[in-house]
Amino acid sequence: MIERWLYSTNAKDIAVLYFIFAIFCGMAGTAMSLIIRLELAAPGNQVLSGNHQLFNVLVVGHAVLIIFFLVMPALIGGFGNYMLPLLIGASDMSFARLNNISFWCLPPALVCLVTSTLVESGAGTGWTVYPPLSSIQAHSGPSVDLAIFALHLTSISSLLGAINFIVTTLNMRTNGMTMHRLPLFVWSIFITAFLLLLSLPVLSAGVTMLLLDRNFNTSFFEVAGGGDPVLYQHLFWFFGHPEVYILIIPGFGIISHIVSTYSKKPVFGEVSMVYAMASIGLLGFLVWSHHMYIVGLDADTRAYFTSATMIIAIPTGIKIFSWLATIYGGSIRLAVPMLYAIAFLFLFTIGGLTGVALANASLDVAFHDTYYVVGHFHYVLSMGAIFSLFAGYYYWSPQILGLYYNEKLAQIQFWLIFVGANVIFLPMHFLGVNGMPRRIPDYPDAFAGWNYVASIGSIIAVFSLFLFIYILYDQLVNGLENKVNNKSVIYNKGPDFVESNQIFATNKIKSSSIEFLLTSPPAVHTFNTPAVQS
């Protein structure tokens, strides 16, 4: 047991560890968001007894837990580690032991984060950790230092993982698997790994300077010593903007597979999809200052960042329309993964549209730090990254676990979270247009109506998550066994396959990617002899 799970060098076992960790942290992060919404359900003090510092600590905890401890471990560490070697026909990840330490950096990081909330009065800085609020004058205890250590540990984890994914993809593809034949999910993880590799060192530099400012009397961000807090913002957002693409691009890969499978068609414009993802990744590094329109940038700088930000809409639009073209004329089956994929397309597009409004420097002066921004990025993250997470789970878990989930319960869970998430985040745009500021635990009575609606929505969404945990339990305990490989023919809940640009065939089934040709669940060691493309 200890040998298998603690010292594991098996990508599949490490992926399972990532999933368990991510589910645990996701529940904690969701609990924090529920407390935030309960506090904001009505004007005045509701649940936090006027402790406004605690409110901000919850905001930090919610953000960091969900970004660094749920979405990245699940999409990249979980699906990436499990599916990428299967999809390229590799026996494991290139650096198997490095993979192990990538995971085991995360539990200590979680310990640091939790500890930071328990000492003094916690780190109430917002997830951006801007000085001077995060400096030693405003946050005197070790809270912020512990939060910085947590970020360092997650950065190490992600960096090592990124190196591992890049080397594995370049060196361990099976015979006949050229780069142009890689499945889209592999491409998405590959591109994400490059984004991590280039952006995380900048974050680490920024928070290390903050650590030195706080403890060793340097003045990187200390105006009295000739420093500038705006430097920190540049460093943070040079990481922070690629980070949001790191969160969503693996989701793009998952959605591509699902849309293709349940439309019984190859993805429309597969190579264009790869170039679109790569363009999004590259452009993501050229737009960071659109988070900083109000710090006093020159007019020409603002003009550039406005234009560059809008250009990202082009490759994103290519992806959306290619997915629609894949669905169009297909033989669509609305299984749960497909429901999530279609919801993803609709809601991600809405999130993108509100983003176009925020891209304008002049408009953003009004929108900055209001709930309009919160509504925008939760549409693209909550209904982009999290929906693709659920979609990937419902798509691949019967193959990974060898057990089916209850389709009817899963559909109910989808509709609950679909309704809940929209009821939470749509009203936030209305609040933001009317000027309700972010990160504030109380508000004038005029904002009460929509805040109450949003809080009702969060209760619906939390119910859907409880239902998901039950579905998971039911699948593991009572799930129907996935005995044979031609299940997609005899059992209507499995995916339908179709001839794609590349065909992997056994005598039972043809598939557009390798993973469904293996036994279910896959053997502990797959591809000891290389898979050869037919």
Swiss-Prot record:
- In Gene Ontology terms, what is a biological process of this protein? mitochondrial electron transport, cytochrome c to oxygen
Q: Where, in this chain's numbering, is Mg(2+) bound?
A: H368, D369
Cofactor(s) recorded for this entry are: heme; Cu cation
Q: Which PROSITE patterns match?
A: COX1 (PS50855), COX1_CUB (PS00077)
Reaction(s) the record says it catalyses: 4 Fe(II)-[cytochrome c] + O2 + 8 H(+)(in) = 4 Fe(III)-[cytochrome c] + 2 H2O + 4 H(+)(out)
Which locations, inside or outside the cell, does it occupy?
Mitochondrion inner membrane
| GO molecular function terms listed in the Swiss-Prot or TrEMBL record | cytochrome-c oxidase activity; heme binding; metal ion binding
The metabolic or biological pathway listed in the UniProt record of this protein is: Energy metabolism; oxidative phosphorylation
Segments passing through the bilayer: 16-36, 57-77, 101-121, 147-167, 182-202, 235-255, 267-287, 310-330, 338-358, 372-392, 412-432, 452-472
Sites where the protein binds heme a3: H376
Q: How does it assemble?
A: Component of the cytochrome c oxidase (complex IV, CIV), a multisubunit enzyme composed of a catalytic core of 3 subunits and several supernumerary subunits. The complex exists as a monomer or a dimer and forms supercomplexes (SCs) in the inner mitochondrial membrane with ubiquinol-cytochrome c oxidoreductase (cytochrome b-c1 complex, complex III, CIII).
| Name of the protein described by the UniProt record | Cytochrome c oxidase subunit 1
Specify the species.
Kluyveromyces lactis (strain ATCC 8585 / CBS 2359 / DSM 70799 / NBRC 1267 / NRRL Y-1140 / WM37)
Give the source lineage, highest ranks first. Answer: Eukaryota, Fungi, Dikarya, Ascomycota, Saccharomycotina
Instruction: Name the gene that codes for it.
Output: COX1
